[in-house]
Amino acid sequence: MGKFYEIIKGETPTLVDFHATWCGPCKTLAPIIEQLKTKKGQSLRILKIDVDKNPAIAAQLGIRGVPTLIYYKNGKQLWRKSGVIPLRELETL
């Protein structure tokens, strides 16, 4: 968990994608996240966290459903949303 907090407190804004391998909407969101990664390049870090492999951090952050995306800048949560989010909305982060 220490590494997670180290990453989100870094200079590069971070979008955290909480997902699960069995989750249908997560599979729908995955190519959208890849498109965002391509468009934003080095200006945005994307961190993917499988909630089944990392249940402690998911519980600590109150992740109740997947996919859930959380946007951090300088360690502060600025945006949070669950479900499949359109690329247009993610580009505004």
Predicted regions and their residues:
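Short pre-active-site segment immediately N-terminal to redox-active cysteine/selenocysteine motifs
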Residues: E11-T12, H19-W22, G65
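Hydrophobic beta-strand anchors of alpha/beta hydrolase catalytic cores
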Residues: L15-V16, I46, L69
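Structural microenvironment flanking redox-active thiols in thiol-disulfide oxidoreductases
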Residues: V51-A58
